[in-house]
């Protein structure tokens, strides 16, 4: 074989080997890429951002409060009726308390004592000794912002069972008003005692009792008509609702008529009610004002007598009444501990002014600071005299109501 031929053969063999090597390299690279395809062809995963939970704000203590005003008896005598008569034969008592409405309408809770039964005109309007008042009395007080009414008095049964039933039916038409002291059945009484009222995040119960009945007892088996006080009844009533509410408010018709002094029975009942967990006791019946007091290490605030709010008992002592303000305050701590207290008591005196024309007319309720000498001579002297009575057991009492501002 010639050398030229051998060289050609070697070149050809070299080309073949070169091609084989190239193919081997390509194949190896392809195999490597296939095996590691995830590394080359898979998009890198984006890092998922973890959602940051909002930081919880530290728990803060909370405070709730409801401002309450209390006034005394709506004791409606002939003079008050006659002054309120309208040409159409009806009654309008609103002008008589219009000035005080500017104060009472500013409060969360506004209380008064309805001394005379609202039996309505159909039973005959009457005055002392057996009272019966038209529904328009209630209308006037509701219009002035009053939304808590005590009905248990020594005059509840003045018109018998029908008088009470008429009164109960009237107040049923005003569910926005908390009433206590008269009911038409035992079931209604129980529901009323255990009813939970609420204002501004504060819950409260309201119960009314009287220790007097003027010898006019309820019919046998119908004690619910007038809420007469016994220690046993009060204990059962209060225990049935105490743990359901922040505050228990009790209205007591008690004390000695026309006496500025608190008697032993009032003190005894007040201390007993306080031991049951009552926070606020509001008194009526004496028809004159008495002192106020914080008892049981501040657990219970007692207003022994608010006196008359409106009447025709023609004497300065009876024309003078007490308007009392307190704040029901609830504090909820960060550990949910709840503390409730009756705080910031404030007081003002009110007076029933009249125009005398052989009899009293033009009845108006105004506060003592607004009195003139024409309306009451020596009103400044009376003011200091009556303030001293109220201050007897609470000497640091603040005078002047928030609602007067």
What feature does the model see in each segment?
Residues 2, 16-18, 24-405:
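Acidic, metal/ion-coordinating pockets
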């Amino acid at each position: 074989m010639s050398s030229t031929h051998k060289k050609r053969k070697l070149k050809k063999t070299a080309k073949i080997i070169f091609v084989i090597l190239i193919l081997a390299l390509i194949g190896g690279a392809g195999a490597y890429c296939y095996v590691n395809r995830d590394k080359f062809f898979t998009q890198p995963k984006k890092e998922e951002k973890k959602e940051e939970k909002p930081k919880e704000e530290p728990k803060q203590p909370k405070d709730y409060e409801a401002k309450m005003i209390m006034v005394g008896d709506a004791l409606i005598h002939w003079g008050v009726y006659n002054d309120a008569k309208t040409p159409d034969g009806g009654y309008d008592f609103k002008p008589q308390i219009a000035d005080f409405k500017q104060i009472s309408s500013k409060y969360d809770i506004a209380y008064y004592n309805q001394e005379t039964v609202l039996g309505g005109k159909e039973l005959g309007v009457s005055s002392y000794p057996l009272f019966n008042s038209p529904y328009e009395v209630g209308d006037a007080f509701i219009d002035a912002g009053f939304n808590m009414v005590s009905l248990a008095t020594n005059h509840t049964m003045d018109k018998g069972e029908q008088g009470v039933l008429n009164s109960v039916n009237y107040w049923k038409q005003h569910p926005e008003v908390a009433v206590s002291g008269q009911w038409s059945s035992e079931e209604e009484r129980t529901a009323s005692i255990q009813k939970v009222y609420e204002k501004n995040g504060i819950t409260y119960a309201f119960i009314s009792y009287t220790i007097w009945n003027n010898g006019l007892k309820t019919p046998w088996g119908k004690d619910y008509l007038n809420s007469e006080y016994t220690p046993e009844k009060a204990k059962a009533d209060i225990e049935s609702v105490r743990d359901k509410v922040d505050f228990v408010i009790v209205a007591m018709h008690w004390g000695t008529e026309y006496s500025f002094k608190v008697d032993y029975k009032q003190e005894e009942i007040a201390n007993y009610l306080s031991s049951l967990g009552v926070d606020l006791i509001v008194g009526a019946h004496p028809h004159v004002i008495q002192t106020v007091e914080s008892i049981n290490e501040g657990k219970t605030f007692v207003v022994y007598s608010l006196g008359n709010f409106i009447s025709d008992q023609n004497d300065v002592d009876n024309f003078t009444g007490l308007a009392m303000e307190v704040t029901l305050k609830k504090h909820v701590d960060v550990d949910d501990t709840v503390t409730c207290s009756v705080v910031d008591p404030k007081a003002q005196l009110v007076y029933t002014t009249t125009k005398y024309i052989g009899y009293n007319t033009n009845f108006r309720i105004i506060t003592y600071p607004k009195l003139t000498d024409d309306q009451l001579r020596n009103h400044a002297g009376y003011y200091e005299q009556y303030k001293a009575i109220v201050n007897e057991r609470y000497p640091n009492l603040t005078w002047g109501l928030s609602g007067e501002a």
